[in-house]
Amino acid sequence: MTESDRHDTPKGDRRISEGAGASPDESNPTDFAPEEFTPAYTPPLARSGTERPSFGRPAADNKELQERVDNLTARNAKLLDTLKDARQQLVALREEVDRLGQPPSGYGVLLEVQPDATVDVFTSGRKMRLTCSPNIDTETLHKGQTLRLNEALTIVEACEFDTVGEISTLREVLGDGKRALVVGHADEERVVHLAEPLLGEVDGEDGKRRRLRPGDSLLIDTKAGFAFERVPKAEVEDLVLEEVPDVGYEDIGGLGRQIEQIRDAVELPFLHKDLFRDYALRPPKGVLLYGPPGCGKTLIAKAVANSLAKKIAQARGDDAKEAKSYFLNIKGPELLNKFVGETERHIRLIFQRAREKASEGTPVIVFFDEMDSIFRTRGSGVSSDVETTVVPQLLSEIDGVEGLENVIVIGASNREDMIDPAILRPGRLDVKIKIERPDAEAAMDIFSKYLVETLPVHADDLNEFGGDRTACINAMIERVVERMYAESDDNRFLEVTYANGDKEIMYFKDFNSGAMIQNVVDRSKKYAIKSQLETGAPGLRVQHLFDSILDEFAENEDLPNTTNPDDWARISGKKGERIVYIRTLVTGKSSGASRAIDTETNTGQYL
């Protein structure tokens, strides 16, 4: 600044400059330096408010930098994980591409393992000798096993045995024990190899292990010539129920004479074989139980099997609880098959199984229920003549060249007149036992099996006998039987007209059965339960039994309505003069007049 400039400066301005300080260090920096001053540190972000000093870093900036470092570290770790996942996906995709690019594999069935570690395999319709991959141990391979082959026909994997194929019936196992003769469709016979699972024991019907036996159904591969497993066949297993029934003679009422007859026919030959041999007496081969429905034919057959098992166990000194016998319950109608020869085949299998069980010294009872449905008189068929071949098959099994030892055939039927006479002749079904309808004495015995002392009895009924429960139950039974068997107007059931013009009144007692008595007792128990729910007083009363009898009689009102009254009478157990007309006389349940049953107008009803 020149001298003239100093003189030209106003006084006020001079005071301001002098007040700022005389030295340049104390003056304003803008007045000291001709150039702009640059600070040593510039914050990265603009700050609002006053300017910060140019030296040092505050704590807020350090925290912000640390947060940025943490964020970058997290992003870096996430990026590394993403890269790893991408790498794994690339590796998996590469493996998938390599797998898809491989040539297809073939399969074969192992026939034989050679000493030089080569293997005979049946594949693509050819028998070939192949080599194994080093990771295959030939000692662990089994005949019939499925093998996987690569494109060079090298065995690379050992698989399981086949589980699908054709079903054939085993005829016999050949002498070497490794092959079998089987019969396929249309009786085509072939020899097949037995796979490893069939060389030993297989699972039987009862869950026990056993050897293969003729009649077993086998799963086979006809091309490879192998049988892989035994297949349980429902059509045969359902027809034959191997069991030891738990029904004893003491559970059967009113059939004392019939029980004695069948015990003499069945049990004596088994228990006293020496005496029969000394007297040269041949035991009977079969027993026919015939009579009206619901009178205990099946119960007797079961009791025979149970009693026979216990008696033989006792004779041998075995535990009676472990007594063993076989009761083959044959459901007659299910044996019938529309294919020619199938029914006969089932009969052969049944008796073949019975012979196998009997060969162990155990008695076997073959029980044919509803025998008239399958073994009816030859030539009597309307739609088919299936009985012309089924009946001879049974005859040959019972009385053929191949005898039956320890096997008893028991047949049950309510139409014995329809069974072929050749079956009923002596030497086949030798013993014929009629199971009759129960009379009053037998009915009391049957009632005592169901009205037991453990049942709750009403207090009023007990008080009549001084609290004696046994006397009360016996009195109930006597009064109920007297009511059922009374020839009163309330018990009239039918008026029957015979071909000669005679008429006869039939009562409900003429159609009583053990099954009906059980039903009466069950109804009375239901009435006792309902009465207890209504009144709160527990116990069975005589009136409950009387009400049950009325309901049972009323429900049987419609049953005689059949196409042929004579056929109905035969099933019901009434035989003799031919019946041409039936008129119901029930007055309990139906409010209408008595109904007549005419053979000419009522057609198409059930038997």
Curated annotation (Swiss-Prot):
Pathway: Protein degradation; proteasomal Pup-dependent pathway. Residues 606-607 are annotated as: Docks into pockets in the proteasome alpha-ring. It comes from the Bacteria. The keyword Coiled coil applies. The keyword Chaperone applies. Keywords: ATP-binding, Chaperone, Coiled coil, Nucleotide-binding, Proteasome. NCBIfam families: pup_AAA (TIGR03689). ATPase which is responsible for recognizing, binding, unfolding and translocation of pupylated proteins into the bacterial 20S proteasome core particle. May be essential for opening the gate of the 20S proteasome via an interaction with its C-terminus, thereby allowing substrate entry and access to the site of proteolysis. Thus, the C-termini of the proteasomal ATPase may function like a 'key in a lock' to induce gate opening and therefore regulate proteolysis. This is Proteasome-associated ATPase.
